[in-house]
Amino acid sequence: MATSSFNINELVASHGDKGLLATALVDKTAHEQLEEQLQHQRRGRKVYIRNVLGVKDSEVIRNRYGGKYDLHLTQQEFAPHGLAGALRLCETLDCLDSFPSSGLRQDLVLDFGGSWVTHYLRGHNVHCCSPCLGIRDKMRHAERLMNMRKIILNDPQQFDGRQPDFCTQPAADCKVQAHFAISIHGGYDMGFRGLCEAMNAHGTTILKGTMMFDGAMMFDDQGVIPELNCQWRKIRSAFSETEDVTPLVGKLNSTVFSRVRKFKTMVAFDFINESTMSYVHDWENIKSFLTDQTYSYRGMTYGIERCVIHAGIMTYKIIGVPGMCPPELIRHCIWFPSIKDYVGLKIPASQDLVEWKTVRILTSTLRETEEIAMRCYNDKKAWMEQFKVILGVLSAKSSTIVINGMSMQSGERIDINDYHYIGFAILLHTKMKYEQLGKMYDMWNASSISKWFAALTRPLRVFFSSVVHALFPTLRPREEKEFLIKLSTFVTFNEECSFDGGEEWDVISSAAYVATQAVTDGKILAAQKAEKLAEKLAQPVSEVSDSPETSSQTPDDTADVCGREREVSELDSLSAQTRSPITRVAERATAMLEYAAYEKQLHDTTVSNLKRIWNMAGGDDKRNSLEGNLKFVFDTYFTVDPMVNIHFSTGRWMRPVPEGIVYSVGYNERGLGPKSDGELYIVNSECVICNSESLSTVTRSLQAPTGTISQVDGVAGCGKTTAIKSIFEPSTDMIVTANKKSAQDVRMALFKSSDSKEACTFVRTADSVLLNECPTVSRVLVDEVVLLHFGQLCAVMSKLKAVRAICFGDSEQIAFSSRDASFDMRFSKIIPDETSDADTTFRSPQDVVPLVRLMATKALPKGTHSKYTKWVSQSKVKRSVTSRAIASVTLVDLDSSRFYITMTQADKASLISRAKEMNLPKTFWNERIKTVHESQGISEDHVTLVRLKSTKCDLFKQFSYCLVALTRHKVTFRYEYCGVLNGDLIAECVARA
């Protein structure tokens, strides 16, 4: 830090505050401080608080989060317990800021009991576990559905293609894996140990959470959290207002005591002067966050750290560590600042003076009352007179007084039910003290022994007194009754933490792994940022791109340790092969495990989504019935999935089923599976073909193949299908394709039929091979292999017992991509043993070659090697590409001789609707209108690419999708588009050609 070259004290002394140098210094300092504040506001995240907050509430939230966020208190609407709601939003953002926010799957964050709609609307990379534990939870879910629908309708383009990521299962039952988690006021129903067990089930390492906190809960039966305007009270059960009067000792050591209590002790949180629903939670769960420190469970040890306690909210974090933990003494304290000015006084609780209870009274009030009571005590007076004196003083010290016309509270008002007993207890305490002092005085002067004792020197008196007290302990004076109790301002807990299970945790290796993984992920993020920056600079209008609708994760050399170990442990054979010294066998086994886990997660997600919809509509796991709010619920879900529907027991559907769609399974109280016409069940888009669970089971039952995998990586139209046709041998080969359309095309090319027995025997999809009986072959010919997961390809080879796989595909076209954004995909890319390239196309016309080269230059990162930079065409067609702008779908020239391609399902649906309006045959809009993804591998003479919207669509920026769209034709290609789309790769290249 730089220092000034002059002395400030001398400067002020010589020139005063009017001096030129002093003024300049003050101006400079003020300018620097103002600049720092402006920079903070620019950097800080803007957080809008809509709740109306008072002056004190505003100061509370600004003191807590004003330094971290740029808070905007808009004062828009009154809300129940507004400060608590505002703090909850800031707490959520604060806890999320503790973890990486890259958006990558490996940085997914779990939220136990949080609001899924908050994360959905803000675009957080979060999966919420939001169980329906009662009517309150269902009400919250219904309200979130309404809020989601309202916001989506106002800005549908922002949420196009996105779906909320949450489940309605308890946290311990959800199977989504993630390293990080948050719990914003979600631990009340789980307790410290319940949170640890949920973390273990999810493979979570670090959890950060918040909860309402008052240390006085360890002592009192009721209290107030003043900042939150919240009153808490212990009740015997959720349905009884009987107070828990357990003594303090029992409360601090209630592990054994709680086992013999008939009812659980609950804590009710009520917000003062607000007629809203309160919260009732188990005291044992709340207490665990105050008393517990560590918990060992299934090879992991979890420890809690209490980070910040502010405004009645405690922020804590739970960290899990694997392996052995040597014994260590863990010590922590809970402080009771609210009772530091109080003293405990025992008062009668029964007329026979057998039962007593302890009440709190201000130390100053008791001290002054007792002082006057001692000075005014006279054993000659009747006890009633002295009792009145004490009551008068006690009343004066705890009532409202008027001084110079101003009313003031003197002391603290005493409960009317305890007022008389407090005065009576002080009277008994005063009388007992006088009697004790009198006895002591009489004993001192009663005999010659006392006089002899008094004549001794002080050392002899001390020695003699110690000997007598040691030999005759019963001679010690002792009090028959103790009235005053000193209230401790803190409680200390000592716990010995140790765990002997598991192996020693290799922290050094873990650090190296995390560093390597972070570098790889950081490079991916840096490349994405650079690409977005380049797009932004290239466009006249600034536009920030969302993540692509479908993306292929970059494989890493090392699997995710947390997720992999959990899956590998379920299958010994593949687990053993992942540790094989033969590298390719280990890679294939790991890929098969990943593919099986991926298909299983797809199935679980489908079940979870359907169960969530079923529960939202009022269904449960016991009865086959739904409630009356069906239209509201299904209208909301229909905005994100047009295939959502209800089949009633009468046989009718709530919405018309799209033509050609047949649902193979449905969901009701009996779960997901085939349903009859007389059943009530619900469906969504995943119920048309639902074979993920079967694919996962079959894959796990196989072993990694040891045969050779060869890949022919050729450009579009290089003759891959022709090559398959020329080398196919029926006696030894089987042809496998990625999808049904490709299988039909290959069957027509080889057998001139798409449904003959011979064609269906030798040409099958990968799913068909895994799910059905099939003969063993020695060689597999795979078409469009890039659309397969590497684990699925290995499973097909293993199922067919093939010793060789010859795979054809284009690595730069659309590759396999995960349909579940929450799954950490790392082994999807094909790893061949042999690779050969083909850079000559026989399909694409001459003018397509420079267009694709230009697209590769613009879209691919610098330094990327692409075979399309040197590809050549043998086509005789020299000019084929044209484009034209259209105003709407009605101007699209629908011709049965052309093949129509769209980037999105929405544009495809619009074209199909237009074809139906024009009464075109069903075969036309079933076979001649496809999306780019569905068109991969297709070859047509005349192709038209249609874009009907000018709203943001990242698919037009991706090289792989644009490449497929531009290389399907042999003779002509026409691009028809509505409006100008920023970043449209095809339009830019066609315009420059």
UniProtKB/Swiss-Prot annotation:
Single GO molecular function: helicase activity
Domain (+)RNA virus helicase ATP-binding, residue spans: 687-838
**Domain Alphavirus-like MT, residue spans:** 72-290
Q: Which UniProt keywords apply?
A: ATP-binding, Helicase, Host endoplasmic reticulum, Host membrane, Hydrolase, Membrane, Methyltransferase, Nucleotide-binding, Transferase
Under the heading Pfam families, the entry gives:
CMV_1a (PF12467), CMV_1a_C (PF12503), Viral_helicase1 (PF01443), Vmethyltransf (PF01660)
Q: Which residues form the (+)RNA virus helicase C-terminal domain?
A: 839-993
Please list where the region (Methyltransferase) is annotated: 51-409
Q: Which InterPro entries match?
A: (+)RNA_virus_helicase_core_dom (IPR027351), 1a_necrotic_phenotyp-det_dom (IPR021002), Alphavirus-like_MT_dom (IPR002588), CMV_1a_C (IPR022184), P-loop_NTPase (IPR027417)
Any Gene Ontology CC annotation? membrane
Q: Tell me the superkingdom of the source.
A: Viruses
Compositionally biased tracts (Polar residues): 542-556
Q: Does the keyword Membrane apply?
A: yes
Q: Which family does it belong to?
A: Belongs to the bromoviridae replication protein 1a family.
Q: What is this protein called?
A: Replication protein 1a
Organism field: Cucumber mosaic virus (strain FNY) (CMV)
